[in-house]
Amino acid sequence: MNAVNILIGLMPMIGWGIFPVIVGKIGGKPASQILGTTFGTLILAIVVAIFRGTPIPETKTFIFCLISGACWALAQIITFHVFETMGVSRTMPITTGFQLVGASLWGVFVLGNWSSSQSKLIGFTAIALIIIGVYLTAWSEDKSSASKSGAVKGILLLLVGELGYLGYSAFPQAVSADGFQGFLPQAIGMTIVGIIFGLTQTKKDYKPFKEATSYKNIFSGFFFAFAALTYLISAQPSVNGLATGFVLSQTSVIFATIGGIYILKEKKSKKEMIAVMVGLLLVLVAGSVTAFIK
């Protein structure tokens, strides 16, 4: 693995790490955030498809990738809602941990990964450590009933959202879709859900299609799409491969968490900062272990 490949592998870290921070900085309601994000992703996906001359996949693959993108958008809407109550710095480590656990369990029970007893022991130990890490990142010194209720509600919502993120990964695998071929259909699926959600949220005092934040968030969509695109490149066997590419991309949670604390000014006590950093370390290290178990 050379320096160029590692640099490519770290590009998703920058894109996915900065994406939630930009969304938080621009602001807006979840409908505006998902509209802008999906519009930005679709624009870049069209540019990439034209530039590469990527052929449109056959009907079944196109539909599965479209559903994949729709699943992501549904999950992301939930995540945007949780940002409002828990903040980026608490939400991102939790959703990253859930995605790592979800991907691992999908691999074990559906794809037949971790076939040996030793692999299962190591893998499920790693999952337990991820769960502990998630708990630490969500921990707060505020013991009020309102704070506890908000945290529990946020975590439960993110668990539901994990089904969408799992669908985002699983549907392309079901048809063995090439990453670049699936990129545009996924972006179309994301945008369809974004538009439908925007229409359902349109009211007399709030019209997401006329909100400035909806179009400012196109910029955040470019960062998400950049990360998704560079991840496709990184995951190719000739670059970093799927396992290494996945682990490198998940380091984006460091950017997002630190950005939430220092750029979005999400306050943490000294004890909470220690808990967050230890939790992040557990999520990243244990997540790396799950990616390399055979």
UniProtKB/Swiss-Prot annotation:
Q: Which domain of life is it from?
A: Bacteria
Q: Recall the GO molecular function terms of this protein's record.
A: carbohydrate transmembrane transporter activity
Among InterPro entries, the record links this protein to: Sugar_transport (IPR010651)
Q: Where in the cell is it found?
A: Cell membrane
CDD domains assigned:
ribose_uptake_RbsU
Topology of this chain in the membrane: Multi-pass membrane protein
List keywords of the entry alphabetically. Answer: Cell membrane, Membrane, Sugar transport, Transmembrane, Transmembrane helix, Transport
Gene Ontology CC: one annotated term: plasma membrane
Broad class of where this protein is predominantly found: membrane
Residue stretches spanning the membrane = 2-24, 34-56, 63-82, 92-114, 121-140, 150-172, 179-198, 218-235, 242-264, 274-293
A Pfam match? Sugar_transport
Tell me yes or no: is Magnesium among this UniProt entry's keywords. Answer: no
| Function, in words | Could be involved in the uptake of ribose.
PANTHER family listed in its UniProt record? TRANSMEMBRANE PROTEIN 144 (PTHR16119:SF17)
| Family affiliation | Belongs to the GRP transporter (TC 2.A.7.5) family.
Full protein name? Putative ribose uptake protein RbsU
Record organism? Latilactobacillus sakei subsp. sakei (strain 23K) (Lactobacillus sakei subsp. sakei)
Please state the gene responsible for encoding this protein.
rbsU
